[in-house]
């Protein structure tokens, strides 16, 4: 699935609830998921880490939706930025 399609899917499924929760509380959920991912990585629990990677991605897309950021455009701009490319 392409990133833009995934962002749209997240919007269709969760935008109403996410909007009601608000950006601040949604950001707190995102931080909690990042913490859970960090714990899974630190403990070497690959199976749990896989689940947490997905959680973090979904919450990131949720935040992007709430802020009306097209994540595909943001990623494309990042990749085109010469300062973000590793030195050769």
Explain the meaning of each model-derived region.
Residues 1-53, 57-88:
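Flexible "arm" and connector segments at domain edges
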């Amino acid at each position: 699935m392409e990133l833009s399609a995934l962002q749209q899917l997240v919007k269709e499924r969760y935008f109403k609830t996410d909007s009601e929760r608000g950006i601040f509380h949604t950001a707190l959920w995102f931080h909690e998921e990042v913490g859970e991912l960090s714990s899974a990585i630190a403990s070497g629990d690959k199976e749990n880490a896989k689940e947490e990677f997905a959680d973090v991605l979904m919450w990131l897309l949720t935040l992007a939706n709430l802020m009306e950021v097209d994540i595909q455009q943001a990623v494309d701009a990042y990749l085109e930025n010469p300062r973000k490319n590793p030195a050769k």
